[in-house]
């Protein structure tokens, strides 16, 4: 399984959010190991329905478009009776939630792309700075060598002059 970058700048997320996301990820991964389906004992259809209707799809918004638990929430509901207006309302709410989740996924992916772009730009800027500093360092080394030679030449000239004044 390949790691993906986060859809946001790392410093904008609080530790409690990261912890909650980590717990959600653990739940998703454990359900993936089981096969991505929810297995219930016979006669628990009502409890199963509660489980999947209370699952918050927004917590899974950062997942990729790959099939997984987000699809399970939409397909694993108990059968509806045709005269039940509550179940149709619940279905509409769930569809709205899934629509919001898709929008969040898309905006999260856009944010991830923007974050990656900023990281690339920052990396390129840092590389330019390193190159500039290396050039500046080399220039300063050459300047130090030149000044060292000049000081040595001046020192010799001064010593020669003092010796010639002493002899005269």
Swiss-Prot record:
Gene Ontology CC entries for this record: CHOP-ATF3 complex; CHOP-ATF4 complex; CHOP-C/EBP complex; cytoplasm; late endosome; nucleoplasm; nucleus; protein-DNA complex
Spans annotated as Disordered: 34-130
Main location: cytoplasm
Composition skew (Basic and acidic residues), residue ranges: 118-130
Modifications the protein undergoes after translation, according to the UniProt entry: Ubiquitinated, leading to its degradation by the proteasome. Phosphorylation at serine residues by MAPK14 enhances its transcriptional activation activity while phosphorylation at serine residues by CK2 inhibits its transcriptional activation activity.
Region spans: Basic motif: 100-129
The family this protein is said to belong to: Belongs to the bZIP family.
Protein name: DNA damage-inducible transcript 3 protein
């Amino acid at each position: 399984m390949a790691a993906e970058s986060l859809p946001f700048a790392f410093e904008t997320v609080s530790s409690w959010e990261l912890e909650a996301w980590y717990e959600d990820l653990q739940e998703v991964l454990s359900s993936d190991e089981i096969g991505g389906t929810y297995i219930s004992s016979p006669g628990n259809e009502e409890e199963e329905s509660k489980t999947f209707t209370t699952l918050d799809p927004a917590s899974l918004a950062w997942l990729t478009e790959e099939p997984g638990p987000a699809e399970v929430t939409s397909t694993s509901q108990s059968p509806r009776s045709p005269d039940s207006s509550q179940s149709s309302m619940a279905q509409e709410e769930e569809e709205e939630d899934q629509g919001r989740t898709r929008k969040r996924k898309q905006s999260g992916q856009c944010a991830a792309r923007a974050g990656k772009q900023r990281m690339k730009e920052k990396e390129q800027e840092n590389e330019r700075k390193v190159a500039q500093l290396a050039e500046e360092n080399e220039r300063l080394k050459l300047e130090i060598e030149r000044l060292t030679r000049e000081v040595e030449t001046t020192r010799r000239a001064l010593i020669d002059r003092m010796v010639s004044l002493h002899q005269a």
